Amino acid sequence: MNYWDTACVLKLYTAEPDSATYLTLAGQAAEPLLASEILATELTYALYQKELRGALKTGSVERVLKQFQADCDAGRWLLLPLGRDVAIRAAQVATACYQRRPPIAVRTLDGVHLATALLAKATHLVTTDERMRQAARALGMTLTP
């Protein structure tokens, strides 16, 4: 199963230059797409930021969020809970990344996503974030694309 980072999920719901690649990848999935339940919150913030920058038509946020919720309700997404196990694993991710030489400056929410993906035993991580990709490689994860 593919675990999806928020930036790549955004490409599924808003037009970006490389959206077609991610729509194809999501469309090929035989099982639900994996993400942390924090995705819904991050997606909301990201959509409003796009709207403020003029990259999303004013008033579109609610429509996009309704579509995302409909996809969740239809079983397209499996949103994994943020529990103590994720917090513990995220701290381990931080230790593994920051103690490397050179260190990988993974951000907090990226660490939460990496921890969630590891706990879910996701087969691939879908992300475009270079720091997150470096951390994932260091943790032995397979990247897509």
Question: What name fits each language-model region?
Answer:
Residues 77-130:
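Active-site neighborhoods of divalent-metal-dependent phosphate/nucleic-acid chemistry enzymes
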Residues 1-64, 130, 139-144:
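Short, well-structured N-terminal submotif of metal-dependent ribonuclease cores
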Residues 133:
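Short alpha-helix immediately C-terminal to the canonical SAM-binding loop
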